Amino acid sequence: MSKLDDLIQKLCPDGVEYKPLSEIFNTRNGYTPSKKEKNFWENGTVPWFRMEDIRENGGILDHAMQYVSINAIKGDPFPANSIIVATSATIGEHALITVPSIANQRFTYLMIKNQYRNEYDPKFLYYYCFKLDEYCKECLNQGNFASVDMKKFSKFQFPRLPMEIQREIVGVLDNYTEVTAKIKASLEKELVARQKQYEFYRDKLLTFDVLRGGTIDFRWRMLCEIADISTGNSNTNEA
């Protein structure tokens, strides 16, 4: 039995309690300040998150690719340690935002209610939201534009675990995340090296120049001499 199993057996002898999303979090939609107001987008101090931020910088974010001025904010920025969940367009993405911020309208903010603030580790909630991502994909409204059924969204269940268990889970997942990142970085370096190797040999093999000890006997031909050339067909009646 693992340490986690021991903790659950010890601290949750009657099983794990679950609470709906709507009980644990306040939710608000993100928004985009008016592009017509240039002062909203100049000398910005408030991070404004988009899907590009997650794709570029990962799922735990403390800065954005774009900032807006405080004048662009409706009320106050959303609080630090909120979670943004993609509930329209690209479904199945989320991030933990560790600074006060806003995000565009593709996201719904999950802001933990005061009475639960000391009961949850933000990183545990971040990791558990990977299950929420999958749930969202199964709760879509019917229509041409992908969006999550927010009534069903509000009913998603979060476990109410003792903080000791949450931190144990976070520690294990942090370790796996770190190992995975190192492997990915190593593979990316290997890929770059192999690409350079490929380009070197490709250029070498396709360069017919004077070699040490002699020459290569070759002749150049115009493309039109060795190939028939035609353009593609734009006939829309063809399959």
Where on the chain are the PLM-derived regions?
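Short, recurring structural edge motifs at helix starts
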Residues: D6-P13, K35-K38, N144-F145, S154-R160, ...
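Non-catalytic DNA-recognition/assembly elements of restriction-modification systems
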Residues: I8-Y31, G213-N233
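Short, solvent-exposed loop/turn positions at domain surfaces
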Residues: K10-C12, K35, N71-A72, L96, ...
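Amphipathic alpha-helical segments
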Residues: G15-E17, D121, S154-E199, L206, ...
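Basic, amphipathic alpha-helical recognition segments used for DNA target recognition
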Residues: P20-F25, E56, I60, V99-P100, ...
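DNA target-recognition patches
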Residues: S22-F25, K35-S69, C224-S230, S234-A239
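A short beta-sheet element
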Residues: R50-M51, D62-F130
